[in-house]
A protein has these predicted regions:
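A short, aliphatic-rich beta-strand micro-motif
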Residues: 114-121
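Juxtadomain coupling helices with adjacent low-complexity linkers
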Residues: 2, 20, 24, 134-156
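Intrinsically disordered, low-complexity terminal regulatory regions
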Residues: 1-67
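Sensory-domain boundary capping and coupling elements
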Residues: 121-134
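Regulatory sensory and allosteric helical modules in signal-transduction proteins
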Residues: 58-108
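Short hydrophobic/aromatic beta-strand element in the GNAT-like acyltransferase core
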Residues: 52, 117, 129
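Short loop/turn motifs at secondary-structure junctions and domain boundaries
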Residues: 47, 107-112
Length: 156
């Protein structure tokens, strides 16, 4: 998969099933975290056309923006703040069907309508999060959660 993804035109789950082995092969041969995060963000954006795909990395007491695909984003997020900070604090995946209904949502873009945030764990500790935003309401479900959690195990 060095330069090209091979993804069919099936449903969401079929696309994840085709993407996962390609991503695993890509990140398992590269030791640089930033390179891997950048390629994962690009692959997810290319495959699914999400509005925004990116990573935040834990640096001391806040999440700091890492590689991403999409419009300019919030640079720093405190523990427990917004969807990303809450997923970090709780150590679990959060699916938000309507970001306007999430208490304390941080609006990096008014075009973001729904969101999923998946923690990246290393030895049981959250070291970052994968954040994906859609410009449509209710874009994410347990299928996304299951496959994105698996992708995050490749990174952690």
């Amino acid at each position: 998969m060095a330069e090209n993804l091979i993804i069919g035109t099936g449903n969401k789950e079929e696309k994840y099933r085709e993407l996962l082995p390609q991503l695993h092969a890509l990140v398992s041969t590269e030791t640089d975290l930033i390179a891997n995060l950048a390629n994962v963000a690009a692959a997810l954006k290319q495959t699914f056309g999400f509005f925004w795909v990116g990573f935040y990395l834990v640096k001391e007491d806040e999440l700091v923006l890492g590689p991403f695909q999409g419009p300019i984003a919030c640079t720093r997020i405190r523990l427990g703040k917004g969807v990303c900070g809450t997923a970090w604090k709780e150590g679990r995946t959060l699916i938000v069907p309507d970001v306007e209904q999430f208490p304390g949502h941080i609006a990096c873009s008014s075009d973001s309508k729904s969101e999923i945030v998946v923690p990246i764990l290393q030895q049981g500790e959250v070291v970052g999060v994968l954040d994906i935003d859609s410009n449509e309401l209710d874009s994410f479900d347990t299928i996304d959660a299951r496959y994105l959690e698996e992708i995050c195990t490749y990174i952690g």
